[in-house]
């Protein structure tokens, strides 16, 4: 290490400019523990290690320059080179003071950054060869200026939040124009972690270093903001608690002076409420036991609040209060007819219940389940039943319920526990014999918390529900006098054990005539009232309502019909509000003006008799539909293609129909070798709509026989029925909806299975007069009615297979 020519006699040398500094290549190294020194930073250091003191002495004996580098571990007394950061700062020792305990205090000023290239000597102190780090000159542009201004603002904000920043530093920052110097000054005054401070020291680009400082300032600002919020909240809470404690103590003192014991009065009120609640003996015994526990507790304890809530529930649950049933059958029938047209099966069942109840007062309530499509009146029917019986009505929706505790409640050990939906509904009703509706029963779910449908088994079992146990109440409750009414759109999702406990009443969709009558009697008056209209403002023609039903709604229920009627009423209300004086008459021609273009067009009827095209009947979630089942043949190597998104059951129906045809090929004059040389393609239009079900078997067989024998099928004949390998026609479901679809499509004849003859009782006589319904037992009877010629004549020549007509069907899920 070179020595200065001039001997230093003062401890505070004159600092020269950075460009005038001559930094020696070899310098003594002073490892520092818990601080990072930046250029131009002035800081006092306490030196206690013998090796470090010798390094300071060596620097003072020369040009006072020393290399400062931070060691990784502050507790390491003798750090090896690999435990010292290789980037540090060359500093000038400005002052030195020897302390009585042998340590040395020095005041140093950082000069320039440098990197340790190698360790030259290790004894008696570390001597290192350094490489000076020259920073690139920052470009003076708007982005740099904006960054520096942002940093100043960030620093001012954290100073306002309580960060100790020297006022002198704030003044210096206002005059600094170099981003690197600004970054170093802030970093040295921010109190950063050792790793963060070292990381900033090692960044050579001044703009990038200042950007990192800005990020650290933003983090510090956010941390100080959160800290201030926590301190304010704690201060407020402490003040609030102290105030409450002071007021509570004052209140206790005042109550003692007045002889007022509010807690005892509350307990006495609870005791009286328990005695007047007419609880069963075992329930009253448990309530008094819990009241005794409450009396022995401090009023402010958490357990006391739990017991008090539990006692409130026991008092409010109706243990013995009932409403007196209205057993007037004539009155009940009148109420049911007022609220709902048709639905005769449901009304008949309720009147039967009233009749039996009149003869046997101890009869338990039935458990009914209404199954039908949306909008047919299942939920509103429950309200009518309650009104007819003079009972309270309570409804809970089970759609989306996935937790058993929703039905049975939570045990009282859980924080915020409450009874389940059943007990809550009974409390809401206020009597022990309400009409209790379990809506959307088929929408129940289940997960790892349990299966709520299993919890309903006890509720809906007349043999068990006289002692229903809720987890929260934990006492038997009698539900046997409750008239449970469940509703569902489909019966398939309901578990069989639960389904078996209920009396299922199917509510099919309405015919167009029924919808028309309901619209005239109920929907139009209700929508006129809801929209503030009177008879002098609007009148609906019957043909206009038919137009709305036929072309603007396609559903089994009435919701869309009421919605469209309401849409017309709103438009009329607007015209009246705008000053229209005359009565507005809604005619069929005016419907399109109010509602726009028709939403549903009739495309079910074919133009002529065609080969290989049959009118099948299907049931959908919105009622019945006519399906045009098409078949064609082509040259090939045998085989059959099925298209139209057919389900497995429908595909098997086609296979069964083809097997029957091949086994009876001679009757239809079909050469057995034909199936080896040709291919068959069966298609059901509306290919985007999934279709499944066995009831298209007859239609499939008829289409195949027609295309194989080239005998056309009558265009005005529709059919439904499953086919067996022996040619038997088997029964199907949804007959009313399917016949309604046939009538709507203009069919003149509907072929149904003989075993469905009993279901004709449910079909209105008016509908049966519009179409000829023919029950059949075998496929030969179907062919005789559906084909133009039967028996099949022998072919005279080879004919080209007929090209089926493609018909576009509405997009909805279809079950044949």
From Swiss-Prot:
Residues 608-789 form the Lon proteolytic domain. Induction: By heat shock. Residues 800-809 have a biased composition (Low complexity). SUPFAM superfamilies: P-loop containing nucleoside triphosphate hydrolases, PUA domain-like, Ribosomal protein S5 domain 2-like. CDD domains: RecA-like_Lon (cd19500). The keyword Protein biosynthesis does not apply. It is found in: Cytoplasm. One of its GO terms (molecular function) is ATP binding. It holds the Pfam family AAA. GO terms for biological process: cellular response to heat; protein quality control for misfolded or incompletely synthesized proteins. HAMAP family: lon_bact. Homohexamer. Organized in a ring with a central cavity. This is Lon protease. It comes from Trichlorobacter lovleyi (strain ATCC BAA-1151 / DSM 17278 / SZ) (Geobacter lovleyi). The lineage of its organism: Bacteria, Pseudomonadati, Thermodesulfobacteriota, Desulfuromonadia, Geobacterales. The gene is lon.
């Amino acid at each position: 290490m070179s020595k200065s020519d001039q001997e230093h006699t003062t401890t505070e040398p004159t600092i020269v400019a950075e460009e005038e500094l001559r930094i020696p290549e070899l310098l003594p190294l002073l490892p520092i523990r818990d601080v990072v020194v930046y250029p131009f930073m002035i800081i006092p250091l306490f030196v206690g290690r013998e090796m470090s003191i010798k390094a300071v002495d060596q620097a003072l004996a020369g040009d006072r320059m020393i290399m400062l580098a931070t060691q990784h571990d502050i507790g390491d007394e003798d750090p090896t080179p690999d435990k010292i950061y290789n980037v540090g700062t060359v500093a000038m020792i400005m002052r030195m003071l020897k302390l009585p305990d042998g340590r040395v205090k020095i005041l140093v000023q950082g000069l320039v950054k440098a990197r340790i290239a190698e360790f030259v000597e290790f004894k008696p102190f570390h001597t290192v060869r350094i490489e000076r780090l020259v920073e690139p000159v920052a470009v003076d542009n708007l982005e740099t200026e904006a960054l520096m201004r942002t940093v100043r603002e960030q620093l001012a904000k954290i100073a306002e939040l309580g960060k100790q920043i020297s006022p002198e530093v704030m003044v210096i920052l206002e005059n600094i124009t170099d981003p690197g110097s600004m970054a170093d000054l802030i970093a040295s005054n921010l109190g950063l972690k050792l790793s963060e401070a070292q990381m900033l020291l090692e960044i050579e680009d001044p703009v990038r270093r200042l950007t990192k400082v800005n990020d650290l300032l933003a983090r510090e600002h956010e941390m100080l903001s959160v800290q201030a919020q926590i301190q304010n909240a704690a201060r407020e809470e402490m003040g609030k608690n102290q105030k409450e404690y002071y007021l509570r103590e004052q209140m206790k003192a005042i109550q003692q002076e007045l002889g007022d014991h509010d807690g005892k009065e509350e307990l006495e009120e609870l005791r009286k409420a328990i005695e007047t609640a007419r609880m069963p003996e075992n329930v009253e015994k448990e309530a008094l036991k819990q009241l005794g526990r409450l009396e022995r507790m401090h009023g402010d304890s958490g357990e006391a609040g739990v017991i008090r809530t539990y006692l409130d529930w026991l008092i409010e649950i109706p243990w013995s209060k009932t409403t007196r049933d209205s057993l007037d059958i004539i009155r009940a029938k009148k109420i049911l007819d007022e609220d709902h047209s048709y639905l005769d099966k449901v009304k008949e069942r309720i009147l039967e219940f009233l009749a039996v109840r009149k003869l046997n007062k101890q009869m338990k309530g039935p458990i009914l389940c209404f199954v039908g499509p949306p909008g047919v009146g299942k939920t509103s029917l429950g309200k009518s039943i309650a009104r007819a019986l003079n009972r309270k009505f309570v409804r809970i929706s089970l759609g989306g319920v996935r937790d058993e505790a929703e039905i049975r409640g939570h045990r009282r050990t859980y924080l915020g526990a409450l009874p389940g939906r059943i007990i809550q509904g009974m409390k809401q009703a206020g009597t022990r014999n309400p009409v209790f509706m379990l809506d959307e029963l088929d929408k129940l779910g289940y997960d790892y918390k349990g299966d709520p449908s299993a919890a309903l088994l006890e509720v809906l079992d007349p043999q068990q529900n006289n002692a229903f146990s809720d987890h929260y109440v934990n006492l038997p409750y009698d539900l046997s006098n409750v008239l449970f009414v469940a509703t569902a759109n489909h019966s398939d999702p309901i578990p069989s054990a639960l389904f078996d406990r209920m009396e299922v009443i199917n509510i099919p969709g309405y015919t167009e005539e029924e919808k028309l009558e309901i619209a005239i009697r109920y929907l139009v008056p209700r929508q006129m009232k809801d929209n503030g209209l009177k008879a002098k403002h609007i009148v609906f023609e019957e043909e206009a309502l038919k137009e709305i039903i036929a072309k603007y709604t396609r559903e089994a229920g009435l919701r869309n019909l009421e919605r469209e009627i309401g849409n017309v009423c709103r438009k009329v209300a607007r015209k009246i509000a705008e000053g229209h004086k005359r009565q507005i008459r809604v005619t069929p021609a005016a419907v399109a003006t109010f509602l726009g273009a028709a939403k549903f067009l009739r495309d079910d009827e074919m133009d002529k008799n065609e080969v290989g095209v049959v009118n099948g009947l299907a049931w959908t979630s919105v009622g019945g539909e006519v399906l045009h089942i098409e078949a064609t043949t082509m040259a090939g190597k045998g085989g059959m293609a099925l298209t139209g998104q057919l389900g497995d059951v429908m595909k098997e129906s086609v296979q069964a129909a083809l097997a029957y045809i091949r086994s009876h090929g001679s009757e239809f004059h079909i050469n057995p070798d034909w199936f080896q040389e040709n291919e068959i393609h069966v298609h059901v239009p509306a290919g985007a709509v999934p279709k499944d079900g066995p009831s298209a078997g007859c239609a499939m067989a008829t289409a195949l026989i027609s295309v194989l024998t080239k005998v056309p099928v009558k265009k005005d004949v529709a059919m439904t029925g499953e086919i067996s390998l022996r040619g038997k026609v088997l029964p199907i479901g949804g007959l009313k909806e399917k016949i309604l679809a046939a009538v709507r499509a203009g069919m003149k004849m509907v072929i149904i299975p003989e075993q469905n003859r009993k279901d004709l009782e449910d079909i209105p006589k008016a509908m049966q007069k519009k179409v000829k319904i023919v029950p059949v037992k075998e496929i030969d009877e179907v062919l005789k009615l559906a084909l133009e010629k039967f028996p099949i004549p022998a072919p005279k020549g080879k004919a080209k297979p007929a090209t089926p007509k493609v018909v576009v069907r509405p997009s909805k899920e279809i079950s044949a």
